[in-house]
């Protein structure tokens, strides 16, 4: 692991909202007296009924209960739109950049208000009200944000299903939350290719009870010819012509659910993560402001999809609650060329950029040329999210993309946490490439060993969180017992993140990967992220994923999937070279037993590597790979199976 330290530059410190002394003071206050701390910061949003109770939380076995600001009432859409109209009605709220570089729009707060009210009225006319669930299955178009905020305006609960999910996955999620109304588009556009969204919705509904879904609202994106079921389906533009652009916002309790978002469970059955209104918005807006050092007038771009929690918290809710200008991108980093990200940054003068390590690594594989063709002079803060970023990719991001003048915030958090938990702050934190550094305000990480004993000082172990924070999920939809079992039964009175971590002598946290991504080689536990980082540090390697597989002698062997940089070819010589490289870097125990050169790795559209699939292939067991429709490129799996290194026959 890299222990290089990058000091806070004077330019970052001078304009930062928080310096090191302020961080330490605020952090100490947040953990010693959370009631007072969050009472103050809870007022960063507007309340129609002010709260008098701040924190009412318990992680006790059999009695897990999380409530924040519970006697207050508010409305998320009111906070994200209406309260800005007087002072910044004509400011751009959303910059939309289409898949095609010639398509973009600027949507002001006034326009956003009108569009959201219109969408809310369309929903209301179809019987949607407080507490009803609405499934959204949309591309990255402005209507996705309008639909989220329209549900929030009415007190309805949105459940977004990412546009890459199959009809089966969509059906199980519609059924899981009992949505009577689905909002979709005729087709999506992604990297120049069309995605048959409406056709997938039709397929999904066929798999459900006939009386479940009453209405399907279809946004015209491509104008493609799609089947419309009379009486059930309606084009959004036609329905919107029948309503006004004024709609009152429903004041809801702080603990009223805002959204359900399904995330993969270890059993393969997705869990409906429930986030509520008040605490979630306080936490999303506060982390957005301080982590990205957001100043009025900044242009902020998070490259995620709204189908993932990052898109919920850091494209829509956090930025808009702060009156920010947030960029929403329909496309992919490599279309029409692999300069696209950097061209968008120059086109819209982006100041803050938040993306995933997997995107950074894949662009890094194409060399510096595509980056250097652009200026990127507007950039000030670069963020990373989704998985641990290896030091080499961190360094490339810092040096090449940011010209060694932008602060990097390597953020660690989860769907379940609602917002960022461990992160540097641009004006406060010395940086170590590969480390998520220190906890955000109110977050108390603890390291425990396998027996649940709390570890002190520099150590490696299981990452847990002691005590609650306002953005924390409240339950698994319809299954509170599963919530308790999954997150609170492993270690008593602690929230177990499922991640392993290392804490160094400076109190910095290094996330080592999911605990189920730990390989046990001859009795030695090893985080896959460490071996992956070592492989990616080799000059010929663009990306690597490491999994365990059954080994006659060691119990588990190390199987590495390696994607090489453009222009490099895989060979037995290179295999040997990589084994020697890792052996030298980490030690003989970490030497890969099998290396498979792969043109690509199976990733979800949000960029997460599907390790479950890689493990199955490494185990020579690919008869039960499960649903691969969520992958960005399902064909990658066929290549991996075809060229696997561990054939039993």
UniProtKB/Swiss-Prot annotation:
Task: Kindly list the positions at which N6-acetyllysine occurs in this protein.
Answer: 608
Q: Which family does it belong to?
A: Belongs to the ATP-dependent AMP-binding enzyme family.
* Keywords, alphabetical: Acetylation, ATP-binding, Ligase, Magnesium, Metal-binding, Nucleotide-binding
Question: Which InterPro entries is this protein grouped with?
Answer: Ac_CoA_lig, ACAS_N, AMP-bd_C, AMP-bd_C_sf, AMP-binding_CS, AMP-dep_synth/lig_dom, ANL_N_sf
A molecular function (GO) term: AMP binding
- Record field: catalytic activity: acetate + ATP + CoA = acetyl-CoA + AMP + diphosphate
The secretion signal range is none
Summarize what the UniProt record says about post-translational modification: Acetylated. Deacetylation by the SIR2-homolog deacetylase activates the enzyme.
Named cofactor requirement(s) = Mg(2+)
Protein name (database record): Acetyl-coenzyme A synthetase
Q: Which HAMAP family match?
A: Ac_CoA_synth
A single GO cellular-component term from the record reads: cytosol
EC category name: ligase
Q: Which PANTHER family match?
A: ACETYL-COENZYME A SYNTHETASE, ACETYL-COENZYME A SYNTHETASE 1
Q: Which PROSITE patterns does the entry mention?
A: AMP_BINDING
Query: Which amino acid positions bind ATP, per UniProt?
Result: 386-388, 410-415, 499, 514, 525
Show the CDD domains listed in the entry.
Answer: ACS
Describe its function: Catalyzes the conversion of acetate into acetyl-CoA (AcCoA), an essential intermediate at the junction of anabolic and catabolic pathways. AcsA undergoes a two-step reaction. In the first half reaction, AcsA combines acetate with ATP to form acetyl-adenylate (AcAMP) intermediate. In the second half reaction, it can then transfer the acetyl group from AcAMP to the sulfhydryl group of CoA, forming the product AcCoA.
Q: Which GO terms describe its biological process?
A: acetyl-CoA biosynthetic process from acetate
